[in-house]
């Protein structure tokens, strides 16, 4: 059974006009290596319970979202999709009359289990857990190095059906991105022809320009909060250099000196941190150099990334987890992609492809490390990623994967998968989820037993991991890539905010 909404009744939950307060017992384990009476060591696992207080502000703000790369395939597709949903637009395809929807969005189109009733499982919308911004109410803006209006950008992208594009054109032809930061050293040379709409000046002047743009956007649109997300070209990997970008002070001094190695994406992120605005990196480049992470932590400003997890990598994070969890040993993973959109064109340059290769290649690391029966220390499956540019297929990316595994008694198992990933139609709802969850997380505060004051989540937002290929985590935090664990983490944190136990799937009431 599916219900649209619910309210929790519990002595551990209190609803006020502006907040939800919950008291939550977090049950976990502590693992220690102890010396026994005979002088040997053994591993001891000790269950423990930590009491947490959560406080969630339920006043939903008017949200503005500024996209870096607003005129790209993702930016134009997302903006078009939100307008179509808000206006209730329908259009004819070769199969049927299609209604606008938010399919592919975790927050808008997925469900969570809330319990059982008369022997039947009860589910509710994911978005019913906590008050969230309605995507129809989001105000979009942003930057692009191309001055093309969003109606023409939508046509250039070749993602949406023509009938839909015709209906959306009046809403989009007057939306023109702000000029963007362009540095030809960081992206493929083939992008130069699009760069007719750029911010001039030194890196310091560019940061100041972005800050001015964000302030004016917020004032003009009368929004309460702004979230900025990078959905522009993948940059080449930025080098970490001691004395240049390893601390906040060094990074800011490097900006003042106009150091060449400070990338455009890092400049946008710096501007956001200085303004207290959340910044999310949707591409695989090394935006978050150590100095920027240091800066975000010291200023307590949310940052998240890296790289949207939409197609091939999402499947890999499921299949890899399944194989290792089933006691099957993956020994070779070969991934081949070809696509024909501007992302593929930019990735045809070796230096930008390297960023994507790094992002895609680490996705099974935590799964391999979890099973010392299958893998010796340091052992890892052979893992190869290939991406080729084929203009004809446009945004309809093809992903082909071959998984070779060792099974019982020396046997071999091979799984081959072909995945047609409509690139921007998969990425757009993920962008939506990222900005909505980033905003929501800024309204949640908590404290553990013994702490005097409530505080926000760590600025490095692991809560967004489900949506990213290479999750950014705080220093010293394990990276979790298994998709089921990432979703469980996100859902269970939100459940804790309303005093609900984590979904453990034991269903003891039916045993």
UniProtKB/Swiss-Prot annotation:
Keywords from the UniProt entry: Cytoplasm, Inositol biosynthesis, Isomerase, Lipid biosynthesis, Lipid metabolism, NAD, Nucleus, Phospholipid biosynthesis, Phospholipid metabolism
Cysteine pairs bridged by disulfides in the record: none
GO BP, sorted A to Z: inositol biosynthetic process; phospholipid biosynthetic process
Pathway(s) annotated for this protein in UniProt: Polyol metabolism; myo-inositol biosynthesis; myo-inositol from D-glucose 6-phosphate: step 1/2
EC nos: 5.5.1.4
GO molecular function: inositol-3-phosphate synthase activity
Binding site for NAD(+): 71-74, 144, 181, 191, 194, 231-234, 282-283, 307, 310, 341-343, 356, 394-395, 423-424
Highest taxon listed in the record's lineage: Eukaryota
GO cellular component: cytosol; nucleus
Role of this protein: Key enzyme in myo-inositol biosynthesis pathway that catalyzes the conversion of glucose 6-phosphate to 1-myo-inositol 1-phosphate in a NAD-dependent manner.
Protein known as: Inositol-3-phosphate synthase
Naturally occurring in which organism (per UniProt): Phaseolus vulgaris
Upper taxonomic lineage: Eukaryota, Viridiplantae, Streptophyta, Embryophyta, Tracheophyta
């Amino acid at each position: 059974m599916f219900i649209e909404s619910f309210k929790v009744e519990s002595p551990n939950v209190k609803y006020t006009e502006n907040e939800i307060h919950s008291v939550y017992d977090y049950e976990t384990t502590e693992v220690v290596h102890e010396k026994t009476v005979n002088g040997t060591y053994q591993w001891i696992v000790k269950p423990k319970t930590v009491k947490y207080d959560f406080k969630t502000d339920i006043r939903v703000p008017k949200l503005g979202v500024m996209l870096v790369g607003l005129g790209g395939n993702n930016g134009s597709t997302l903006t078009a999709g939100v307008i179509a949903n808000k206006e209730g637009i329908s259009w004819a395809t070769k199969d049927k009359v299609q209604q606008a929807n938010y399919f592919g969005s975790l927050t808008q189109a997925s469900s969570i289990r809330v319990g059982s009733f008369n022997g039947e499982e009860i589910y509710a919308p994911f978005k019913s857990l906590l008050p969230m911004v309605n995507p129809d109410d989001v105000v979009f803006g942003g930057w692009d190095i191309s001055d093309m209006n969003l109606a023409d950008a939508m046509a250039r992208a070749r993602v949406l059906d023509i009938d839909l594009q015709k209906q959306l054109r009046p809403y989009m032809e007057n939306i023109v991105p702000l000029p963007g930061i362009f540095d030809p050293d960081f992206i493929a040379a083939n992008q130069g022809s699009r760069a007719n709409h750029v911010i001039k000046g030194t890196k310091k002047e560019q940061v100041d320009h972005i800050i001015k743009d964000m302030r004016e956007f917020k004032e003009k649109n009368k929004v309460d909060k702004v979230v900025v997300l990078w959905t522009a070209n993948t940059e080449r990997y930025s080098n970490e250099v001691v004395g240049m970008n390893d601390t906040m002070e060094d990074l800011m001094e490097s900006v003042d000196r106009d150091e060449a190695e400070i990338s455009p994406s890092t400049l946008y992120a710096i501007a956001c941190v200085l303004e207290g605005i959340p910044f999310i990196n949707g591409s695989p480049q090394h935006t978050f150099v150590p100095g920027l992470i240091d800066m975000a932590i010291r200023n307590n400003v949310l940052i998240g990334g890296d790289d949207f997890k939409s197609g091939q990598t999402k499947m890999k994070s499921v299949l890899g987890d399944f194989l290792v969890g089933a006691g099957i040993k993956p020994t070779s993973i070969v991934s081949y992609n070809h696509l024909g959109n501007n992302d593929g064109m930019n990735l045809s340059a070796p230096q930008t492809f390297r960023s994507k290769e790094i992002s895609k290649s680490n996705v099974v690391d935590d799964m391999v490390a979890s099973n010392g029966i299958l893998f010796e220390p340091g052992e890892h499956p052979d893992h190869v990623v290939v991406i080729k540019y084929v203009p004809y297929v446009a945004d309809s990316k093809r992903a082909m994967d071959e998984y070779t595994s060792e099974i019982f008694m020396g046997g071999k198992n091979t799984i081959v998968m072909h995945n047609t990933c409509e690139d921007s139609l998969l990425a757009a709802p993920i962008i939506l989820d990222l900005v909505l969850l980033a905003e929501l997380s800024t309204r949640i505060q908590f404290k553990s037993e013994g702490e005097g004051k409530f505080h926000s989540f760590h600025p490095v937002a692991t809560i967004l991991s489900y949506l990213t290929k290479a999750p950014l985590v705080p220093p010293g935090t394990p990276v979790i890539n298994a998709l089921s664990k990432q979703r469980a983490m996100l859902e269970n944190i939100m459940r804790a905010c309303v005093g609900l136990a984590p979904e453990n799937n034991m269903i003891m009431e039916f045993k």
